[in-house]
Amino acid sequence: VGNSGTILTSSDGTTWTSRTSGTTEHLYGITYENSTFVVVGDNSSGSGTILTSSDGITWITRTSGTTNSLWDVNYGNNKFVLSDGAGGIQSSSDGISWTSRVGIDTYGIWGGAYGNSKFVVASVWGYIFTSSDGTSWNNVISRSANALNDVVYENSTFVTVGVNGTIQTSSDGTSW
């Protein structure tokens, strides 16, 4: 996914095909689970962008319920969880209908991941938040004085990355 509604698909990772997304918004995050792709993006039209697809070819616009840009989307604990540029969190069991959750940081959540039975999201102000259910969130003060851009979970380790070369690791999402 990328600028101006760009969605590319590939069956081999070498040859890529451009797909019609139905939007000109910049797209920032994508995840796939339960036979559903969910893509999130910008809000220049007045609403954060959510697109879904069962095949990666045909895309349907969904209602986001927010005027904020949507930065990332993840799946875990039987639900999709997305974050927005103003710290809002939404969750969905199907990627189609979304429920707003209590905002966790007024300065924006840029990236997140699911692993070790919890969601972990990172903020532009260097804070990290965790949730086991995608609904109730705990603030974990990170050691970073820098903006954090994303979180991944692999090999039993969460990794955050941010500006000025910031990299932090955690096995539990709480101690960094």
For every predicted segment, state its role.
Residues V1-W176:
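Residue-level hotspots at or immediately adjacent to binding/recognition sites across diverse folds
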